[in-house]
Amino acid sequence: MAEHTDEIFYRSLYRIRRVEEEIVRLYPSDRIKSPVHLSIGQESVSVGVCAALSANDIVFGTYRGHALYLAKGGDLNSMMAELYGKRDGSARGKAGSMHLIDLGAGMMGTSAIVATTIPHAVGYALAIKMRRENRIVAVFFGDGASDEGVYHESMNFAAL
C-alpha cells in the first residue's frame, strides 16, 4: 500500500461521508428520482477492502452501494446523475441508487434484492479462475444475506 495510507483512507472516508450527507440534505426536495439507502457508518469497510484491491479487481455490492461505488473509483458525477435519473448516469438514469455500476472502475453492480449479487460474484470468480487470470472478486453483503438459500448455494459452488 502507498505511503501515507492513513491520510488516503481518511480523505476517502471523509469524501464518501460528505457525499452521503449531501444526499440526505437533497433527498426531501424530491429531485432525486430513486429511493436511497445510505452507507453512513459503513464507509470504512468499502474503503479498506478497495484499498487492498488493484484496478483490475472487481466488486459486487448491495443496495447500500454508494460507499463501495466511490471507494472502488466509480465516477461521482455519474453516480449523482443516476440518482437524478439523468441519461449520463452510471446506468443511463434507469437504475437509480440501488443499482450502481461502473464497469471501467471494476464496480460490477449493486442490487436491491438481498443476496442476489453473491452468485454473480461467485460465477465471475470461477470464470477468472478458469481463464487463469490474476484478479480478485469481492462481494459485499449484509448479515441478512446469510439467511438466504442463494448464499449457501453460492458457498457450495465456490468450494468447487
What is the role of each PLM region?
Residues 21-24, 29-160:
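Cofactor-binding active-site loop characterized by glycine-rich and histidine/acidic residues
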Residues 1-8:
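Charged, compositionally biased N-terminal leader segments and the immediate start
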